[in-house]
Amino acid sequence: MDLFCKIDKVEIKTNPENQKFDIFYKDKYKPKKKEDFLINLNIINKLDSIIENGVSNFFISGQNDVGKYTLAKYFIEKYFENPCIIRKYTFVNNNKELIYYKSIYHYELHIDLHNCNIINLVQSFLQYIVRPNNSGSNKNVILIKNVHLLKPEILNLFKIYLDKYYNNIFIFIGKKF
């Protein structure tokens, strides 16, 4: 009795229509609808009313791991009515690198202790991503994560951009100051 068999090389054919994008574990189980959230629904209702009444800049603050980033992503996906799939990019200016994330609809800057505190680099990056004031239906969304780690000079730079480029939506996420 032969217990071994020969297996020829098999090619797996994927259907590109069914494989639109990779789904990570965290993306698969994150809340997608208002009812999926496990937090106070008043917060979600306020976000929905911000979208309905016209969007402005806002700051989401709280302790670690309470869902600030998830709320911001919910807001962006609800605002553009599409899922946001982000990719990692590198912005280079004067031999300094700044890593950021971008989707079709928005930009994300994740701040840590080692980046984003060089004012010329951040200013060049903001000049690169902000949209001038024009009459478009949707605004350009820029999400800044861990804003509490920024130096005061960089925060003042963001204030200038908030005042000057009002056709952009800045979402700041961080701990309370």
Residue positions per predicted region:
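P-loop/Walker A NTP-binding region and its immediately flanking N-terminal helices
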Residues: 1-176
